[in-house]
């Protein structure tokens, strides 16, 4: 039986030109082109950081994992929102005669909001899939973060005051209200690293970053808001974007530009440990994740059964809708409905109710 590993990541623009960024942004918005001023802002951010190394780094990670696993598995690489797209790579896997595939998403934590977006593309009449849900507890990855933070504390901070700020990509608040495990996983991940470093609860905190402006509430505190709200600052802030493993715009701009600029404004030293990228400790974590999971059951994947629409909303979610009269329906969702029709659009409960409230959908 021919087996494969499919390593997947978010993707990035294929060219750092306006239309290249527009194409990528349109894919993120499910085929609805954002407004030009939104595209311009994202394009300017990419230009500010000199482009993105994400695709190069990810391909190197894939090659290193493949070399470690040997001939036992064929290793493939796909993106969610840029080429090579997941459905195209699955088509190539079918042509290569693959029958079983372990899906390794290059995001250590599991979220309905993000990881489920990969799962919906896993369709094949030939291939059975095994999706690794999360791998943030891998000891090699925990040691990586602890070791790199320890270097900063020893070589840069020394005896000065400091705070370690663990940050993770934010998710809409409705994901939490559906029982999304992501938030608890981030807190646990941060605590595990902090314990390895011997940090007290006063020496570290959790924040969120990189939320999208789509008119719905996100998990707080946002890292920039957190910095602005502090009445006193330590000598050093150490930013640890723990939900990511590779350098890309949400680290190189959101942390290294926006957080750095605020630190400059407040007279605080900015630090960020290097991302794992192709470090051997990350490769150890990825390979061990495969080994730990490879004997689990493979199955024909049914992504239509793995959507938000299948999840039962909590009373808390309904209360958010009732109490948030100022919620605005995301513009891209309105455009998507108009373009594809309601019957062809899967959406979370909260957004569905927002559409009904706006008179765009018949009430259930």
Swiss-Prot record:
Pfam hit, one: Ferrochelatase
Binding-site residues for Fe-coproporphyrin III, renumbered to this chain: 29, 118
GO CC list: cytoplasm
This protein's name: Coproporphyrin III ferrochelatase
Pathway: Porphyrin-containing compound metabolism; protoheme biosynthesis
HAMAP family to which the protein is assigned, alphabetical: Ferrochelatase
UniProt GO molecular function: ferrochelatase activity; metal ion binding
Signal sequence coordinates: none
Catalytically driven reaction(s): Fe-coproporphyrin III + 2 H(+) = coproporphyrin III + Fe(2+)
Biological processes annotated in GO: heme biosynthetic process
Localization in the cell: Cytoplasm
UniProt xrefs under Gene3D superfamilies: 3.40.50.1400
UniProt KW Transport keyword: no
Keywords: Cytoplasm, Heme biosynthesis, Iron, Lyase, Metal-binding, Porphyrin biosynthesis
Family designation: Belongs to the ferrochelatase family.
Cell membrane is among the record's keywords: no
Lineage, opening ranks: Bacteria, Bacillati, Bacillota, Bacilli, Lactobacillales
Annotated residues for binding of Fe(2+): 169, 250
EC class (word): lyase
Enzyme Commission number(s) from the entry: 4.99.1.9
NCBIfam families referenced in this protein's UniProt entry, alphabetically: hemH (TIGR00109)
Its job: Involved in coproporphyrin-dependent heme b biosynthesis. Catalyzes the insertion of ferrous iron into coproporphyrin III to form Fe-coproporphyrin III.
